[in-house]
């Protein structure tokens, strides 16, 4: 049934021709952004790798026939093709705001149009090829007369159509209405133009409008990031019907194909929609099928002359789909295609399950091998029960229970929050927090409030407090311990309040009249600290362990058949024999990746970015892009924030002159803490480009210390997520690492600390990498780079103590457990270097790390 024009039409599935893969074209090194088809059947693709390529089918294969290279850094975002009187023309919309015009017989552009100020994200040729339309991030639509365009001389009389307030993403024309056009924008509106005059404004989408299809002079369709197709009446500028996608969160393109509409979008799918005029004359659009492709995003789709469908993927490929059995791909291609799709869907399913059940997986260090066992914790459940299940699954002794429970709480904020009673928020420095502790600095000063939330790690809360009050980083472990202890007290207090009974000697969980013998959940004995015997009741742990606690050892009695008596069972870390090649302590090896510089709202960075943006010519950011960057300072890193506009903002702003890059890198180091943006900028070619850009900045040795600080912080924060870790762990260290080490020796303490933190994170990434596979070279290279930079320093007294401690952490971690690397360090006289570093610190934690390094050299 037809709806009122505002509700979603329910989707049905009907039979349709079965599409299968015909060809997979490895077209571009990065995203294939746009497609076009010539009258002769040639396929054209434009990519983010700065190329446009022509593909012709010869026999059963697609072969590249032409390639047009764009200048370095000028990615292709839109293309349009036209047959003119003097030959074909290819129009290429580029990121710098230019439109390059190519033709036959020469590789260089016939002309370059410069009227747009920013990225040209859409191009359209009208049906008679008399005019081209272009849309840009500068919010303008420009109409270009192209009938007499040639390679020698022609002066354009362009028509600029202002009206949209944000980027223009799609264009269309009416075949039966000359000089009448449509434009769709990020401002959520569609405008109908006659020349440069706005005839109508269509409002109905709730997000960016990305695609347009004209059906007749009186009707058209639009689609966008709200996941809907809307059927519009031109005369009244009103919605006729609205249809919801079955596949895409965002719809990126929409194309007509015989009796179907094709849409591509965010989820790497191709959706088929059947069009039916309906008995009542109303148009009905029904989602019939969704084809999964291996790629993450599908940017565009075009119908070929033989009715096959070409789909542009974010993986740089072009996927050709067909219904003709004679054009079906060979079995090996089909198998590979299906395997990639299955892998993608499997990963998606696992991700959805994990999100649905809110399950967190952490690695538990039981014996001398780091990250050996997986522990899965479901948010909102009792960490004690989780620890019991973990022990049972892995056949571990019950005396590990307390240690594993604490381990879970230390690493998972939701576990610490379990059973915490809700209380009134406290306000510190104008912000609300769950709790706050008083910290006395001495010297007669009043206590400072150290705030923390139950959903954040003690380490992070302590780091925030240290940064806010400019305290030594060496006090972070102590402050984090205070917060952790307070969380434990709060948790116990909440448990007591819930039970309703508390014994002043044993605490909660004692015997309660008429209550279940094990309802307390713990049943702690005031003398043994372990589970007591309860007649006719199962052990308080929830599974039968066969013993209760020994009052002297806290462990169970000897049992000949017990699995823990095999000689190979796990034991507490404190009971392990000391291994001088693997020293352990609060800071050794590096306990986790350090994230630096997250305090504050970034008002100064935002103001500076806007100021410097006004000075840019080719790479000026539009309001959409600036707003996207501003959001980075207000969204938590757990939001997994990402958007194409934000990505493009960085791609453009990183092209600014070096002296203008300080605010850009300030935003980038925040972006790298978000999983999606980290994955985007640190993956494959983009990752190598990022590393190259950071190297270029440090090589230029800018006078601006803040710029060098932010380069080091970008490197450090890149280790926040796996893709960034893999990038820098696999990067050639001979160039970048020495540059970072050089910053450690700078006279500015803030630069020393930022660079040393980058090195510490680097060492941890290489250590974790070596645990998975033997790869000696990178650790050796990092060690050599550090030693080459610091071995000639006679005294480190001018360095900040915090930076020295981080540097020592980097050294001990890169050597940790690897006899070959330790031997290399020993041959390079690291004991003497460690002694000089030890002399420069007064803090015991720093001195202990230096002693650990010396002890390691004695072990080989």
Swiss-Prot record:
GO BP term, pick one: proteasome-mediated ubiquitin-dependent protein catabolic process
A GO CC term attached to the entry: nucleus
InterPro entries assigned to the protein according to its UniProt record, in alphabetical order: ARM-like, PFU, PFU_sf, PUL_dom, WD40/YVTN_repeat-like_dom_sf, WD40_repeat_dom_sf, WD40_rpt
Keyword list, A-Z: Cytoplasm, Repeat, WD repeat
Tissue specificity annotation: Expressed in intestine (at protein level).
Chain positions covered by the region annotation Disordered: 494-585
Cytoplasm keyword on record: yes
Function summary: Plays a role in protein ubiquitination, sorting and degradation through its association with cdc-48.1 and/or cdc-48.2.
Domain notes: The PUL domain mediates the interaction with cdc-48.1 and/or cdc-48.2 C-terminus. The PFU domain mediates interaction with ubiquitin.
Protein known as: Ubiquitin fusion degradation protein 3 homolog
The organism of origin for this protein: Caenorhabditis elegans
